[in-house]
């Protein structure tokens, strides 16, 4: 049975967090100039093995539509301005000119609505990012290291593993605020005869969007189902490449008042692990259940924006 919503006393101990941070650190593991962090765990064989998971040749987007509407989950709707190019810019004779249109986008994608990837430079601690790089914006108004462009050079292709909590628990959704611990993951592995391993993209479905459909909005910054920060130890031991969730992977509340996104900090700063937030995993869940599967080929390629702390993203499952 999954852990209840109540936190044990030790969850609030900052000392546990600090000790774990030191224990799991990947700083220097792949060299002092490494820019990829746990993406180094994805080998050629990981990609080749992921191909074998394509049985039906079907694809599913794991992204939500980017919303233009403000709501309690979306504090920053995308601003989208379409335009038609003036005729005099499309040909020497405006009467015979081609017709074309374009767009201007403005988006603040970090938050609780837009599906996005957190690049490794999204979080710092004491002025340092993963591998000791300075957590600072340079004179060119960009981070010099660990930007999403580094992830975009190779993209992310590997085996995807879906921990589908509602299916495992036999419910429509897992109540917001439920904490998932290492022992819960291992119970899921045992039941499904799957071992999460090196190079995997580990996705957690909580049923967030189904809870929204049935019960409406709630204050997500105070209650969100996700991993307890100690799961970072599991991610390190298993050499997981990337984590993602229909929430933000972190459980809210984290149990540490000064660390709202405790797992985010451990994953990004200590492990050097990119994170996928606000995914739509519902259709994937239905199709994998139909096939009695939990794994698939995962593909994602973020925008290559120099030094950016992440980007909107449209991951794809191929099965």
Give the residues covered by each predicted segment.
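Active-/binding-site microenvironments in catalytic and ligand-binding cores
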Residues: 6-319
